[in-house]
Amino acid sequence: MRSIISAFILSLNFCTQPLVRGAPSAADWQELQKAVEGRLFTAEPLARPCFSTFQGKSVEPNVEECSTTKQHYLNSTFKTAAYAGFVHSYNEACASNVTDQCLLSADTFSTNGKNTSGTAPLTGPCNLGMLSEKYIAVSRAEDVQAAFRFAHRTGMPLSVKATGHDYAARSSLKGSLALWTRQLNDIAFNPSFTPVGGSSSPIAAMTVGGGANLGEVYKFADRHNVTFIGGSSGTVAAAGGYSLLGGHGTLTPTYGMGADRMLEATIVTPDGELRIANAHMNSDLFWALRGAGSATFGVVLNATFKVEPVMPLTLALMSFNSTGANTGPFLSLLMKHTNIWAEEGWGGPMSMSTLALVNPAMSVDAAKQSMKEVADYVSAQGGTVVLESLPSFYAFYTKYVEAASSTGTGAATFATFRTLPKRLHQSEEGRAAMTKTFRDIKAAGHDTFIFQTTPNKFPYEPGSNAVHPSWRDSYWLVGTSISWSSNDAGLEERMRVAAAVQEVSKNLTDLAPEGSMYPNEADPWTRNWAKEFWGEENYARLVQVKRKYDPHGLIGCWKCVGFEDKLMETESAFRCLGAFQKKR
């Protein structure tokens, strides 16, 4: 069966390029500017005001703008408020060309949000990197339709950026016209929503603009006395990124993934049509959007999600100082209790010396019993144990998550995370294999992060969306993150980091070949990425949907549906990351 599917995919000969290719003329740009009513802009890097040269030409630094950028350079809210701002610098800089970037080094920006000294212009390279030269600040469907007409007529490729909280450089593309959707941030609550064309009983739902971030969505939901189920990073676009590639968080075990909770989407497809996609209309597109929809099948203007009532949560928060010898027993305890905790509805992150799990259906007294053995161990290590009741998810988010999720974005951090099948927890051999893999990762100098955020208790209908099936047969999503030491990192260091990320990916794949890489937090150099992100059967179906709605390949991104590995060598836009791809 596998070989048949693989042969079928190869035989599709998918067209990834527009009908015509060539540089748009001045008249083309003028016509586009008129069509989008002045919302076409010329881009420059966020740090450009600090430099005296840009793209090899002398420019005037702007001391005031430079000071503001330096002051907030580590703040993801500040960065994602601008087209040129990205949480991870390889989205705006060409990773494999250390001169094709315009970044601030650690000795020039503030690490505490205070003003920095020095007004002299910086002397390093300042070039466009991965940024588009032109972008449209999208505010309506007609802007997107105009962009698709422009792309079809001129051959200019398109890219889509919502907030730019992106681990795989999917929201930027050198040489493209960018569609920046951050201004599509309207949010509405409907206590009795019914999908267009449907006849099901109305349910409470929120309609979220493609550029609205999770922090904004959580605040809005709390004001309307409901709970929006999402992740931990407030600057991630709820409808424009998080849910389109799956979406997991602390409440996922009980309430499902972001893709599971989407009821309807409004999208402009590359043929210029404004479409409603749900279970009753354009159902093939709706299936694909929920799990594989990032900058692939069109531009999502908004999406509607089921919401839950406000609910009290019980938090179990534990940590201790690692001595090396005391992490093994702690990991064994996590493995021992994982299946029980999954049935009880606990969800959240863990590591070799920490635990932060949330439960929407358990009292503090019951939690004390559930967590007793682990809490006793942590206390014996001189650690901290907190068991606390919180009145709502928003109370938990604002107290424990919000501040931490908006910092630490100065350089380049690469992630690699994989689902681990339940079978590994169900035998001594499986638990020993996990322990060895985690130790190998630690020996290589990297920390292992464990997310008990798979949808174990959610009543999923098999095959109802494009999320990889392994999520339904896993307790844990496991991986690590590895960063360059600074934005000044040389090519040799960048190559070492890329190799290290790929080595951890190999370790995790060897441990659990039937698992999957999570597309939102995947190794950018994932091999066999179509299978790893979605599974071969899903991918064959996804390519058919792509061909139907985007037959000329007007829109695309790094290792999204329709991407071909040969583009890493033939297209300069993809060589920035492709140069680090290991060949095995």
UniProtKB/Swiss-Prot annotation:
InterPro entries found in the cross-reference section: BBE, FAD-bd_PCMH, FAD-bd_PCMH-like_sf, FAD-bd_PCMH_sub2, FAD-linked_Oxidoreductases_BP, Oxid_FAD_bind_N
Glycosylation sites (chain numbering): N75, N97, N115, N225, N302, N321, N507
Top EC category: oxidoreductase
UniProt keyword list: FAD, Flavoprotein, Glycoprotein, Oxidoreductase, Signal
GO MF annotations, alphabetized: FAD binding; oxidoreductase activity
Induction summary: Expressed exclusively during fungal penetration of host leaves, the time point at which plant defense reactions are triggered.
Pathways per UniProt: Secondary metabolite biosynthesis
Family: Belongs to the oxygen-dependent FAD-linked oxidoreductase family.
Function: FAD-linked oxidoreductase; part of the gene cluster that mediates the biosynthesis of a tyrosine-derived cytochalasan acting as a fungal signal recognized by resistant rice plants and leads to avirulence in Pi33 resistant rice cultivars. The first step in the pathway is catalyzed by the hybrid PKS-NRPS ACE1, assisted by the enoyl reductase RAP1, that are responsible for fusion of the tyrosine precursor and the polyketide backbone.
PANTHER family: FAD BINDING DOMAIN PROTEIN (AFU_ORTHOLOGUE AFUA_6G12070)-RELATED, GULONOLACTONE OXIDASE
Record protein name field: FAD-linked oxidoreductase OXR2
Organism placement in taxonomy: Eukaryota, Fungi, Dikarya, Ascomycota, Pezizomycotina
